[in-house]
């Protein structure tokens, strides 16, 4: 006969079930436990990496050359100073190299760290050769990023603002183009110890953000990269170079300088259409335009460095100044011939009237009597005595030849000079030809995108 299960059997069954469920719950760690375990593992990895690590020694010392791969992301380019020949650039500067001492094994493949870890390991001593002032951003914390992969490859990124030199050749100003370089390399390590390479192909090694241009007077045409070797007294060093190609915008200078110069030259030629007797008006035109050109030439040079050669704008202003000054000289020449009374270069409108010649007097017996004029005495008729006296007193006139004087040159009034007529055609024609040649020469020049490579 089978025995029915008792109370003790049910109790044992419940105890077994609870123990099974409890064992499963203990076998699955909570999220807090997982985070605690990851932090512990992370700390142990970092401690193990820095254990015995000497950041004074470069990777591969005595075995191989340390290769540093670089690339640049430009967040802001500009402004550019023509007077100081420099430019300002804001970049994310990335460097990557391999350090076998920092290999690790763990649940993660990449260690994402900040600037605190960067100060405890070896980093390249990169500096900018043509930098006047470089600033590493530290607000609110130093803007530095460090990544370490499990094979010991490091990525080190910094945000920098660099003010660098930009040598400019201003012969074609303001239709000029420039290649502003950014040169960097190792300060202490020669190419036998540290070499630099671009991370990607040249077209992608330096990238400028689409909204990164901060230029008012230039267009950023593009950038090119290069590398070379620089020889110094301490050895040969690898230098990485990036050229930013700029083309100046001419609109500002057309409004500020070129149009005023052209209008001033045209204004000086208005005097050719005034009568040459209008001395005050033509004098005002000449003197005013000369002074205006002098002011324009001085103001055009204020924004440029004091270079020892003439720029394209200087040549334009000089030619305009020559036209204005020539117009003043032309008026002086016309006025000179007008005052001398020469009629060879004008039309005589009012002929000169002949002068009356007075009768000459002949002195006779201490008295003066006209020689060519006889007077009929008004004598009373029928008085023979008076008639005899009058007859004896009459003086026989002598024939006197009139004096002949050389004809004086005719003076002209309200006339037009032949010099003015010629100037009305010659001056505008020559000025138009000059502008055609000037603008065709400078505007058709293509900017040189290839900059000189560093000395090797």
From Swiss-Prot:
Residues glycosylated per entry: 38, 138
Disulfide pattern: 166-180
Cited PROSITE patterns: NEUROTR_ION_CHANNEL
Annotated InterPro entries: GABAA/Glycine_rcpt (IPR006028), GABAAa_rcpt (IPR001390), GABBAa1_rcpt (IPR005431), Gabra-1-6_TM (IPR047024), GABRA1_ECD (IPR047079), Neur_chan_lig-bd (IPR006202), Neur_chan_lig-bd_sf (IPR036734), Neur_channel (IPR006201)
Topology of the protein relative to the lipid bilayer: Multi-pass membrane protein
Extracellular compartment residues: 28-253, 302-311, 442-456
Membrane-spanning ranges: 254-274, 280-301, 312-333, 422-441
Keyword tags: Cell membrane, Chloride, Chloride channel, Cytoplasmic vesicle, Disulfide bond, Glycoprotein, Ion channel, Ion transport, Ligand-gated ion channel, Membrane, Postsynaptic cell membrane, Receptor, Signal, Synapse, Transmembrane, Transmembrane helix, Transport
Range of residues in the leader sequence: 1-27
UniProt activity-regulation remark: Allosterically activated by benzodiazepines, the neuroanesthetic alphaxalone and pentobarbital. Inhibited by the antagonist bicuculline. Potentiated by histamine.
GO MF annotations, alphabetized: GABA-A receptor activity; GABA-gated chloride ion channel activity
CDD domains: LGIC_ECD_GABAAR_A1, LGIC_TM_GABAAR_alpha
Annotated 4-aminobutanoate binding sites: 94, 157
Subcellular location: Postsynaptic cell membrane; Cell membrane; Cytoplasmic vesicle membrane
GO CC terms in record: chloride channel complex; cytoplasmic vesicle membrane; GABA-A receptor complex; postsynaptic specialization membrane
Main location: membrane
Reaction catalysed by this enzyme: chloride(in) = chloride(out)
Gene Ontology terms: biological process: gamma-aminobutyric acid signaling pathway; inhibitory synapse assembly
Free-text function comment from the UniProt entry: Alpha subunit of the heteropentameric ligand-gated chloride channel gated by gamma-aminobutyric acid (GABA), a major inhibitory neurotransmitter in the brain. GABA-gated chloride channels, also named GABA(A) receptors (GABAAR), consist of five subunits arranged around a central pore and contain GABA active binding site(s) located at the alpha and beta subunit interface(s). When activated by GABA, GABAARs selectively allow the flow of chloride anions across the cell membrane down their electrochemical gradient. Alpha-1/GABRA1-containing GABAARs are largely synaptic.
Family of the protein in this entry: Belongs to the ligand-gated ion channel (TC 1.A.9) family. Gamma-aminobutyric acid receptor (TC 1.A.9.5) subfamily. GABRA1 sub-subfamily.
Assembly and interaction partners: Heteropentamer, formed by a combination of alpha (GABRA1-6), beta (GABRB1-3), gamma (GABRG1-3), delta (GABRD), epsilon (GABRE), rho (GABRR1-3), pi (GABRP) and theta (GABRQ) subunits, each subunit exhibiting distinct physiological and pharmacological properties. Interacts with UBQLN1. Interacts with TRAK1. Interacts with KIF21B. Identified in a complex of 720 kDa composed of LHFPL4, NLGN2, GABRA1, GABRB2, GABRG2 and GABRB3. Interacts with LHFPL4. Interacts with NLGN2.
Entry-linked PANTHER family: NEUROTRANSMITTER GATED ION CHANNEL
Entry remark concerning the domains of this protein: The extracellular domain contributes to synaptic contact formation. The GABA-binding pockets are located at the interface between neighboring alpha and beta subunits.
Name assigned to this protein: Gamma-aminobutyric acid receptor subunit alpha-1
């Amino acid at each position: 006969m089978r025995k029915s299960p008792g109370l003790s059997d049910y109790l044992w069954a419940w105890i077994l079930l609870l123990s099974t469920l409890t064992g499963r719950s203990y076998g699955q760690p909570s999220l807090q436990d997982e985070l605690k375990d990851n932090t512990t593992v992370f700390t142990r990895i970092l401690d193990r990496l820095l254990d015995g690590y000497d950041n004074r020694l470069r990777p591969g010392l005595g075995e191989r050359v340390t290769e540093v791969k670089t690339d640049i992301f430009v967040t802001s380019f500009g402004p550019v100073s023509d007077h100081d020949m420099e430019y300002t650039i804001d970049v994310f500067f990335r460097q990557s190299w391999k350090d076998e001492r920092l290999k690790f094994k763990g649940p993660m493949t990449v260690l994402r760290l900040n600037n605190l870890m960067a100060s405890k390991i070896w980093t390249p001593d990169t500096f900018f050769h043509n930098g006047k002032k470089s600033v590493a951003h530290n607000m609110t914390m130093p803007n530095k990023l460090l990544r370490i992969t499990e094979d010991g490859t490091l990525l080190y990124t910094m945000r920098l603002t660099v003010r660098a030199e930009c040598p400019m050749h201003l012969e074609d100003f303001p239709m000029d183009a420039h290649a502003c370089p950014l040169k960097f390399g190792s300060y202490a390590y020669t190419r036998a110890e540290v070499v630099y390479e671009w991370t990607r192909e040249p077209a992608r090694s330096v990238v400028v953000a689409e909204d990164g241009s901060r230029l008012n007077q230039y267009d950023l045409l593009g950038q090119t990269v290069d590398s070379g070797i620089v020889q110094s007294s301490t050895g040969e060093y690898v230098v990485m170079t990036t050229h930013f190609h700029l083309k100046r915008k001419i609109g500002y200078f057309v409004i500020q300088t070129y149009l005023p110069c052209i209008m001033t030259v045209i204004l000086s030629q208005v005097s050719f259409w005034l009568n040459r007797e209008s001395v005050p008006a033509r004098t005002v035109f000449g003197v005013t335009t000369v002074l205006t050109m002098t002011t324009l030439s001085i103001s055009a040079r204020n924004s440029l460095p004091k270079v020892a050669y003439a720029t394209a704008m200087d040549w334009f202003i000089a030619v305009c100044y020559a036209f204005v000054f020539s117009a003043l000289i032309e008026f002086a020449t016309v006025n000179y011939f007008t005052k001398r009374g020469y009629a060879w270069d004008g039309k005589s409108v009012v002929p000169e009237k002949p002068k009356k010649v007075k009768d000459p007097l002949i002195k006779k017996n201490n008295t003066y009597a006209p020689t060519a004029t006889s007077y009929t005495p008004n004598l009373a008729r029928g008085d023979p005595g008076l008639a005899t006296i009058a007859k004896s007193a009459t003086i026989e006139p002598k024939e006197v030849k009139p004096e002949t004087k050389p004809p004086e040159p005719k003076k002209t009034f309200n006339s037009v000079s032949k010099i003015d007529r010629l100037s009305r055609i010659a001056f505008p024609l020559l000025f138009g030809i000059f502008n055609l040649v000037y603008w065709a020469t400078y505007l058709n020049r293509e900017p040189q995108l290839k900059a000189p490579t560093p000395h090797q």
